[in-house]
């Protein structure tokens, strides 16, 4: 077996202190880690689905797309793309500091992967909504986590939700063990899985033990306020603060609280726009974009200072951004906007808030 048939070991990581960049305030339980076989110590080759596919002729901000799309192949033994690895479980919509903490713990044990599901909205009939992180920008974010993860950028591996929706908790863990051949899993204390979310973290631990893989559960990551005291004098924003979550990020974006968004994400929020070159207009340092050109969720209507515009491989340009219902305006001190390549039909621009 990939994990040497070792009995599952369970660890609880405590995060009662607010996380800081580079901080690793942890409390580990007394259980001992049983090491997996040597295969889990290697960088397992993967044929994971690419997250940065764009039409060939579309240029892009350098740090968003130019890192190159790695397409590692399956090993000669035909192993699963995540075989022998430590898999973090979650939805990973926002790639916030709570998600990063899962990746950090996975990297402490072995080769880190993020296992997420695609197609949930279509299967469950949810109303379509813009992602928090543009799909083409996810690799950049994960690469920025390498410094927290032993200089290894976590790899994101996707599974079609329709293919696992019907699985009960036991069948799901069996898939992780026997089909995907993972060595261990990391999940948050509120993680739910299986058909109709019938399984919880404690059942995950029990089932992983039954199937001979390790399970690691971490406490919820809280924002800097940690605990919200609900009083009548408390404003609506402070009532919303507490556990870091993708929902909280969406609420903060809608409220235009980009400082709080930066805290939750552990980085400034970046919006990517895909616009026809001929539609990019600049008058006296003012660039106008239609919100329909945005590939991910912008902050709510308002004026945002201390922003940055990223164009191709050029240095970020300081700017002010005005967001309204149908347009996004970028104001810079440069009188004229220089396209990275005017021969291209489309331009991809990055706008960073805060």
UniProtKB/Swiss-Prot annotation:
Enzyme class label: transferase
Cofactor(s) recorded in Swiss-Prot or TrEMBL: Mg(2+)
Pfam families xrefs: FAD_syn
Domain of life: Eukaryota
Biological processes, Gene Ontology terms: FAD biosynthetic process; riboflavin biosynthetic process
Subcellular location: Plastid, Chloroplast
MF (Gene Ontology): ATP binding; FMN adenylyltransferase activity
Catalyses which reaction(s): FMN + ATP + H(+) = FAD + diphosphate
Region annotation Disordered: where it falls in the sequence: 228-248
Keywords: ATP-binding, Chloroplast, FAD, Flavoprotein, FMN, Nucleotide-binding, Nucleotidyltransferase, Plastid, Transferase, Transit peptide
UniProt EC number: 2.7.7.2
SUPFAM superfamilies on file: Nucleotidylyl transferase
Pathway: Cofactor biosynthesis; FAD biosynthesis; FAD from FMN: step 1/1
Gene Ontology CC: chloroplast
Transit peptide stretch: 1-75
PANTHER family the record matches: FAD SYNTHETASE 1, CHLOROPLASTIC-RELATED, PROTEIN-S ISOPRENYLCYSTEINE O-METHYLTRANSFERASE
Function: Catalyzes the adenylation of flavin mononucleotide (FMN) to form flavin adenine dinucleotide (FAD) coenzyme.
Name by which UniProt lists this protein: FAD synthetase 1, chloroplastic
Provenance organism: Arabidopsis thaliana
């Amino acid at each position: 077996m990939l994990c040497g048939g070792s009995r599952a070991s369970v660890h609880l990581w405590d995060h009662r202190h607010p996380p800081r960049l580079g901080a690793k305030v942890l409390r580990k339980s007394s259980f001992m880690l049983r090491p997996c076989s040597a295969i889990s110590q290697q960088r397992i080759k993967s044929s994971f689905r690419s997250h940065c596919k764009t039409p060939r002729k579309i240029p892009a901000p350098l740090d968003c797309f130019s890192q190159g799309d790695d397409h590692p192949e399956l090993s000669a033994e035909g192993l699963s793309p995540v075989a022998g690895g430590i898999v973090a479980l979650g939805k990973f919509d926002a790639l916030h500091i709570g998600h990063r903490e899962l990746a950090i713990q996975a990297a402490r044990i072995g080769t880190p992967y993020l296992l997420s599901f695609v197609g949930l909205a279509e299967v469950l009939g949810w109303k379509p909504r813009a992602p928090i992180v543009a799909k083409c920008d996810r690799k950049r974010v994960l690469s920025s986590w390498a410094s927290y993860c032993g200089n290894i950028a976590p790899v994101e591996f996707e599974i079609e939700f329709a293919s696992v929706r019907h699985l009960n908790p036991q069948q799901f863990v069996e898939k992780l063990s026997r089909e995907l051949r993972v060595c261990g899993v990391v999940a948050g204390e509120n993680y739910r899985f299986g058909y109709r979310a019938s399984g919880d973290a404690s059942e995950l631990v029990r089932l992983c033990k039954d199937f001979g893989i390790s399970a690691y559960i971490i406490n919820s990551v809280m924002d800097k306020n940690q605990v919200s005291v609900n009083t009548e004098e408390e404003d609506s924003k402070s009532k919303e603060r507490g556990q870091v979550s993708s929902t909280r990020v969406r609420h903060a974006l809608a409220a235009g609280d980009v400082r709080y968004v930066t805290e939750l994400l552990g980085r400034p929020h970046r919006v990517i726009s895909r616009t026809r070159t001929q539609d990019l207009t600049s008058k006296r340092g003012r660039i106008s974009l239609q919100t329909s050109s945005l590939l991910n969720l912008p902050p709510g209507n308002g004026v945002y200072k201390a922003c940055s515009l990223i164009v191709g491989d050029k240095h970020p340009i300081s700017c002010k951004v005005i967001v309204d219902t149908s347009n996004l305006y970028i104001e810079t001190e440069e009188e004229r906007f220089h396209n990275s390549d005017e021969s291209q039909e489309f331009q991809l621009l990055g706008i960073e808030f805060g």
